[in-house]
């Protein structure tokens, strides 16, 4: 799992980075990677990658990284469609990224 996290830290911001690229970086085929990752995390590989990106985005919002707007954050964490990012973030955290950002700003 350490190797997976090392690769994720280096590649999460690349919008072209996905399941196949993770498998290639680890020297595994997709099937083996999927089985190993599911055993460790309980998640399909694509969802693991997406959740990793969403966690980084959430931290960026909390840390108010360079006053970035939501679209900039979406691109920064490897999403190439800000609307899809918003849908994923809302599904994951139960609140839109904009609302989450507003809440963080109010608490500051």
Where are these regions (language model features)?
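…primarily DNA-binding HTH/wHTH and HhH modules…
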Residues: 87-108
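Terminal helix-turn-helix DNA-binding modules in bacterial transcription factors
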Residues: 39-80, 102-108
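Extended hydrophobic-aromatic, low-complexity segments
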Residues: 15-20, 34, 45-48
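Basic, amphipathic alpha-helical hairpins
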Residues: 5-17, 37, 41, 59-68, ...
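Append "Primarily bacterial transcriptional regulators
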Residues: 20-28, 33, 37, 71-80, ...
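Inter-domain helical "communication" segments and dimerization helices
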Residues: 1-14, 24, 102-108
């Amino acid at each position: 799992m350490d190797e997976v996290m090392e690769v994720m830290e280096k590649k999460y911001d690349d919008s072209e980075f996905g399941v196949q690229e993770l498998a290639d970086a680890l020297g595994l085929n997709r099937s083996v990677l999927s089985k190993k990752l599911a055993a460790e995390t309980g998640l399909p590989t694509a969802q693991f990658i997406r959740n990793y990106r969403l966690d980084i985005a959430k931290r960026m919002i909390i840390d108010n990284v360079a006053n970035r707007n939501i679209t900039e954050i979406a691109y920064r964490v490897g999403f190439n469609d800000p609307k899809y990012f918003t849908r994923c973030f809302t599904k994951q955290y139960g609140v839109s990224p904009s609302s989450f950002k507003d809440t963080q700003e109010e608490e500051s």
